[in-house]
Amino acid sequence: MKKDPYLEVKKQLALEAANLVEPGMLLGLGSGSTSREFIKAVAHKHKQENLDIRAVASSKESHSLAKSLGIPLVDDEEFTEIDLAVDGADEIDPQLRMIKGGGGAIFREKILLQSSRRRLILADESKHVQVLGKFGLPIEISPFGRSSIIATLKNLGYLGNLRKNSHGGFFITNNRNYIYDIHTPNVYPHPEEDLLKLLQIHGIIEVGFVIASVEVWFGYANGQIGKKNTGRV
């Protein structure tokens, strides 16, 4: 397995973010490599300080990791408000608009962010881009009418492929849907417009753009952490 050149940066970000965790909090746990480090850091703090916290996870992988490390988890159908949601991102532009969902959990990730009083995105410096799109844009689509949905997307100029799993079959999300990865267009200077256009298509469950009020912490190889806020409501 290829070594992650930003692993130490992600660990530092995770430790810094874990300092925000206070007794009595309900945490939203994101998905991906940076969120994995945050879960580990929170578990260590929970164990060392006997911290009274609970959490809800955006993916089966994050849920399993948190459970294995002793973080108490709540029923993912019963939470209403989350105190702090921490997640990563695949790309972030200068306006702090981002693409998420590379791990296939965008629908649940967005619900956790929407439900949280404080939303924190952790990202290493490689995730900062001038224009969104090079990573690709994942969207979650319904199995029902799959071919029709994809045909509609292609007619609008959104070309891509259904994501495959490691066994060669179609990748299935935790919600039993498909992921369609758009590779053309590969630049989104006005993601708000594309987001609205895509969400008007029946059968699209969620789109990988995140345009919301969030804090973003960028971690750099020199050990510095840059903290920014969108200022959006």
UniProtKB/Swiss-Prot annotation:
GO terms for cellular component: cytosol. Disulfide bonds: none annotated. Keywords: Isomerase. The active site is at 109 (proton acceptor). Pathway: Carbohydrate degradation; pentose phosphate pathway; D-ribose 5-phosphate from D-ribulose 5-phosphate (non-oxidative stage): step 1/1. One of its GO terms (biological process) is D-ribose metabolic process. GO terms for molecular function: ribose-5-phosphate isomerase activity. The keyword Isomerase applies. InterPro entries: NagB/RpiA_transferase-like, Ribose5P_isomerase_typA_subgr, Ribose5P_isomerase_type_A. Its EC number is 5.3.1.6. It is an enzyme of class 5 (isomerase). Catalyzes the reversible conversion of ribose-5-phosphate to ribulose 5-phosphate. Homodimer. Belongs to the ribose 5-phosphate isomerase family. This is Ribose-5-phosphate isomerase A. It comes from Chlamydia abortus (strain DSM 27085 / S26/3). The lineage of its organism: Bacteria, Pseudomonadati, Chlamydiota, Chlamydiia, Chlamydiales.
